[in-house]
Amino acid sequence: MIYDVRQETIYNYDSPVAYAHHVLRLTPIDRAHQRVHAAALDITPTPIERREGQDFFGNRITWIAFDQPHDTLTVRVAARIAVEQAVAVEPGDTPPWEEVREAAFASADPSPQAPAHFLFPSRQVSLDPEIRDYVTLSFPPGRTILAGATDLMNRIKAEFVYEVGATTASTTPPMSFALRRGVCQDFTHIMISGMRSLGLPVAYVSGYLRTVRSRGETRLEGADAMHAWALVWCGPVVGWIGRASCRERV
């Protein structure tokens, strides 16, 4: 399946900004079952400096700088991406979560996809005892890693409320957990925080959600949305599997 993606991001400042530096991570990348045929960024106003590169994990980065007053910044993304349907992995075909934890801490793999990079707290995801206790209920002794992650995903979908505006980009996992509401970013952070508290590698992924319209319904531009989900490491044989703990209303 080939998708044409268009995204427009607009920043409005309270007062003109004379100097600004930004780091953009908006360009899709090639990965398993995904190939980028074309991608372009259009930035208004035109930056005085623009550099392209990639980070340690392979994400494409654009650095931009401005030296003239401006009160609005607009970034437009256009991309054509080919996506192949991945072969589904049954939860019962993955190892027990305790074995995955042992394998993660024993791994000496230094590559960007290694589990060691996704075991510990970060600036965005703290480890919280209340979240750990909540997540522990999904991981009784001997349950397979993907069965536990799927159970946790379904519990969050059932017990938390998807509400735009209830949180912000700076909301921490303990804050959204206490609220029991938020958006896909918040629910993904809760899932990551809790599973990492158990010693399980989980990564954060952002991308796009394609909605499915009813038969005869016209697809409206803007009906689809940016999305975030968790990648769960299921051991060295199975690798990384995605789980979305978000109740979307689009």
Question: Which role does the model predict for each range below?
Answer:
Residues M1-A106:
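Intrinsically disordered, low-complexity N-terminal segments that are enriched in acidic
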Residues M1-D4, H33-D42, E163-G165, H189-G194, ...:
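A broad, low-specificity signal for short, low-complexity segments enriched in glycine/proline
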Residues P96-G182, I190:
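Secondary-structure boundary elements
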Residues T150, N154, D186-R247:
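Hydrophobic/aromatic-rich core segments of domains that either
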Residues Q85-A88, V164, M195, G199-V202:
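Long, hydrophobic, amphipathic alpha-helical segments used as structural scaffolds
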Residues Q54, A178, A203:
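Short glycine- and Lys/Arg-enriched binding-loop motifs that mark or flank ligand-binding interfaces
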Residues P28-H37, A108-P110, K157-F160, Q185-H189, ...:
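Short low-complexity stretches enriched in small and charged residues
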